[in-house]
C-alpha cells in the first residue's frame, strides 16, 4: 500500500512513476475525488458536533433558568440525525479509499529500468556456460518418462492437467533438493528455518498483495474464507502482521519450504508439458524483514543467496533486472534469475528476488522501533525463491543428461541421495 501522505502531497510524482508501469492509473483520480469528499464530510461532521456541544450547554443553562428549550432540543435532534448520516457516509468513503489504495501497485524504484514488456528487461549478468551436447537433446519430461521418475499421465487421471507424481529416484531427488536448499540457507546464509501453514486467510493474502487484485489467480477453499498459498511468502510475511518488531532484532531472515498452488489463469497453451508450469509445486522461499536504509544492500545479498544454489548445482543462469512494465504489482525493484534449459535453447525463470520497500508492511501493519524512545516505523520486506524445486529438477535432468538417457546427479546432491550418482533409464 502506498503512503497516503505521499499521494496527497506529491500526486504528480506518483503519477509519473506509476505511468512507467504501463498500467491504468485512473484510480489515482478516483483517490483524489474520494479523498476530497471525505475531507468535506469530516469538516461538516466536526462543525455539527461542535455546534451540538455548544447548544447542549445552552440547553443546560436554559433548563436551570426554567426557560423553554424545546426549539433547541428539536434542532439538535435534526443535527444528531445529520451527524449519524455523515458518520455512515464517512465509513463508506473510508471503505472506498481503502479499496483504491489496495488496488494501486507499488512505486518503481528509480534504478528500475523503464520498459513496457519482458523484452525491455535488462540482462544484469550471467554465470556459467551452457553445455555443448554432441547428441540430440531430450526434454526433461522424456528423460523422466524413460527413467520412470515422473508420471504426468496418472496425475492427470487422479487430479487433472498440470499435476505430477514424483516416483522412486524422482521423489528422492525432489526431497534431496529441498533438504540441500534449506541446509544451505539456514546453515550458511543465516536464515531461520520455517515450515508454514499451506492455507491462509483473506487478511494474509491482502497483506502481501495477492488480494484483492489477483483473486482469480488464487485457489480458494469453499466454505471458510481460506486460500491455498501461492508461495510461502504469504504466511511467512504475515507472521509479523500487526506487530512492532524490535529494531535490535533486524534484519530477520526466514527460509521456508512449502507446496505452492497457482491457478495459472491466462496461461492456457503455455508450457503444457513438463514441470515448468504446474498448478502445484514445491519451493524454498527466502523472506527478509529489514530497516529501510538497509533494504537495497539486503536485496543484493538475497540475489546472491539464490544464485549460490545454482552455482553449487553447476547450472548456468542469467540475472535480469526487471523493467517497470514487468515488475509485478508489489515490487519496487526485482531481479529474476533464469536457469538454462537446453531443450528450449533458452533461459527460464527459477527465482524472483524482490524489494517491496514498505509496500507490504503498510498493508500488513508491520513496524519496528529503533529504540524504546523512537516512534514505530514501517519495516521493508523482501522475498525471493531459493529455489523453485520442480524447475530445478527440470534443469538438472536436461543439463546433466547423457546420450543413453541417463541423468548424472550433481555432486553436491549425492550425500542427500544416499550416494546415488546417476539415474538410469529403465
From Swiss-Prot:
Pathway assigned to this chain's UniProt record: Aminoacyl-tRNA biosynthesis; selenocysteinyl-tRNA(Sec) biosynthesis; L-seryl-tRNA(Sec) from L-serine and tRNA(Sec): step 1/1
Signal peptide limits: none
Subcellular location, record wording: Cytoplasm
Annotated EC: 6.1.1.11
GO MF annotation terms: ATP binding; catalytic activity, acting on a protein; serine-tRNA ligase activity; transferase activity
Record PROSITE patterns: AA_TRNA_LIGASE_II (PS50862)
Amino-acid positions noted as binding L-serine in the UniProt annotation, renumbered to this chain: 231-233, 285, 385
Catalytic activity: tRNA(Ser) + L-serine + ATP = L-seryl-tRNA(Ser) + AMP + diphosphate + H(+); tRNA(Sec) + L-serine + ATP = L-seryl-tRNA(Sec) + AMP + diphosphate + H(+)
Gene3D superfamilies hit by this protein: Bira Bifunctional Protein, Domain 2, Serine-tRNA synthetase, tRNA binding domain
One Pfam family this sequence matches: tRNA-synt_2b
GO biological process per UniProt: selenocysteine biosynthetic process; seryl-tRNA aminoacylation
Main location: cytoplasm
SUPFAM superfamilies: Class II aaRS and biotin synthetases, tRNA-binding arm
Entry coiled-coil feature ranges: none
Gene Ontology terms: cellular component: cytoplasm
Keyword set includes Ligase: yes
Top-level taxon in the UniProt lineage: Bacteria
Subunit structure: Homodimer. The tRNA molecule binds across the dimer.
Biological role: Catalyzes the attachment of serine to tRNA(Ser). Is also able to aminoacylate tRNA(Sec) with serine, to form the misacylated tRNA L-seryl-tRNA(Sec), which will be further converted into selenocysteinyl-tRNA(Sec).
Protein family: Belongs to the class-II aminoacyl-tRNA synthetase family. Type-1 seryl-tRNA synthetase subfamily.
UniProt free text on domains: Consists of two distinct domains, a catalytic core and a N-terminal extension that is involved in tRNA binding.
The protein's name: Serine--tRNA ligase
Amino acid at each position: 500500500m502506498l503512503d497516503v501522505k505521499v499521494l496527497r502531497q506529491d500526486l504528480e510524482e506518483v503519477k509519473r512513476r506509476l505511468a512507467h508501469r504501463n498500467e491504468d492509473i485512473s484510480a489515482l483520480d478516483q483517490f483524489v475525488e474520494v479523498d476530497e469528499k471525505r475531507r468535506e464530510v469530516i469538516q461538516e461532521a466536526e462543525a455539527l458536533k461542535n455546534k451540538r456541544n455548544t447548544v447542549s450547554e445552552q440547553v443546560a443553562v436554559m433548563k436551570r433558568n426554567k426557560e423553554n428549550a424545546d426549539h433547541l432540543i428539536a434542532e439538535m435532534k435534526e443535527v444528531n440525525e445529520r451527524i449519524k448520516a455523515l458518520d455512515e457516509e464517512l465509513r463508506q468513503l473510508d471503505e472506498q479509499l481503502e479499496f483504491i489504495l489496495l488496488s494501486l501497485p507499488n512505486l518503481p524504484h528509480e534504478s528500475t529500468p523503464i520498459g513496457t514488456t519482458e523484452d525491455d528487461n535488462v540482462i544484469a549478468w550471467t554465470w556459467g556456460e551452457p553445455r555443448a551436447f554432441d547428441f540430440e537433446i531430450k526434454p526433461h519430461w522424456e528423460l523422466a518418462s524413460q527413467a520412470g521418475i515422473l508420471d504426468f499421465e496418472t496425475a492427470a487421471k487422479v487430479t487433472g492437467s498440470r499435476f505430477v507424481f514424483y516416483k522412486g529416484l524422482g521423489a528422492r531427488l525432489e526431497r534431496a533438493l529441498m533438504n540441500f536448499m534449506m541446509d544451505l540457507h539456514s546453515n550458511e546464509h543465516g536464515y531461520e528455518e520455517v515450515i508454514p501453514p499451506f492455507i491462509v486467510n483473506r487478511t494474509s493474502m491482502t497483506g502481501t498483495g495477492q488480494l484483492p487484485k489477483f483473486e482469480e489467480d488464487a485457489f480458494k477453499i469453499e466454505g471458510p474464507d481460506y486460500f491455498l498459498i501461492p508461495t510461502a511468502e504469504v504466511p511467512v510475511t504475515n507472521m509479523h502482521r500487526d506487530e512492532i518488531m524490535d529494531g535490535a532484532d533486524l534484519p530477520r531472515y526466514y527460509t521456508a519450504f512449502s507446496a505452492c498452488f497457482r491457478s495459472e489463469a491466462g496461461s492456457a497453451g503455455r508450457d503444457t508439458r513438463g514441470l515448468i508450469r504446474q498448478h502445484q509445486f514445491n519451493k524454498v522461499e527466502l523472506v527478509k524483514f529489514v530497516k529501510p536504509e538497509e533494504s537495497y544492500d539486503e536485496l543484493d545479498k538475497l540475489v546472491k543467496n539464490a544464485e549460490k544454489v545454482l552455482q553449487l548445482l553447476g547450472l548456468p543462469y542469467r540475472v535480469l533486472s526487471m523493467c517497470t512494465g514487468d515488475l509485478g504489482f508489489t515490487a519496487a525493484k526485482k531481479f529474476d534469475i533464469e536457469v538454462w534449459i537446453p531443450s528450449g535453447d533458452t533461459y527460464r525463470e527459477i527465482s524472483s528476488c524482490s524489494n517491496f520497500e514498505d509496500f507490504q508492511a503498510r498493508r500488513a501493519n508491520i513496524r519496528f522501533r529503533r529504540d524504546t524512545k523512537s516512534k514505530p516505523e514501517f519495516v521493508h520486506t523482501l522475498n525471493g525463491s531459493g529455489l523453485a524445486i520442480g524447475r530445478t529438477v527440470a534443469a538438472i535432468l536436461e543439463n546433466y543428461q547423457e546420450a543413453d538417457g541417463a541423468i548424472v546427479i550433481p555432486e553436491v546432491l549425492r550425500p542427500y541421495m544416499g550416494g546415488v550418482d546417476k539415474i538410469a533409464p529403465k
